[in-house]
């Protein structure tokens, strides 16, 4: 019986939350769009300034950055080194592809502006702090 309660039907609190969200006015969602567009633009401008090639998301809150120039065969290893040496967290892009893709990492930009600015300041020095492989 407990199994039925956990797997059949949506939980009542989640249904109430969904109704609340559906009743928000258009201005709320327009404000969210403006906020996240602004954060995206800030982050992409910083990546551009740091010379880090990247995708331009059209609706997602993350960006894929190309790490090919660093020579790592493993995006996981690169992410570990990036966190340790540069102090910036990223997710290996290979986590999101069926194919063997190891030259992309994913950054999440739905953060406080101050957090993004701090990360971008660190990424400005990525070529000095993250060792290159195979050179």
List PLM regions with ranges.
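PLP-dependent class I/II
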Residues: 1-135
């Amino acid at each position: 019986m407990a199994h039925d309660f956990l797997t059949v039907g949506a939980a009542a609190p989640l249904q109430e939350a969904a109704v609340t969200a559906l009743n928000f006015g258009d201005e709320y969602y327009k404000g969210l769009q403006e906020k996240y567009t602004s954060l995206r633009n800030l982050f992409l401008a910083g990546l551009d300034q740091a010379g880090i090639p990247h995708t331009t998301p059209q609706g997602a809150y993350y960006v894929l950055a190309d790490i090919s120039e660093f020579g790592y065969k493993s995006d996981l290893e690169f992410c570990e080194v990036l966190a340790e040496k540069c102090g910036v967290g990223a997710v290996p892009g290979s986590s999101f592809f069926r194919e063997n893709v190891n030259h992309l990492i994913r950054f999440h930009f739905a953060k406080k502006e101050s957090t993004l600015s701090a990360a971008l300041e660190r990424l400005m020095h990525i070529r000095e702090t993250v060792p290159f492989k195979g050179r």
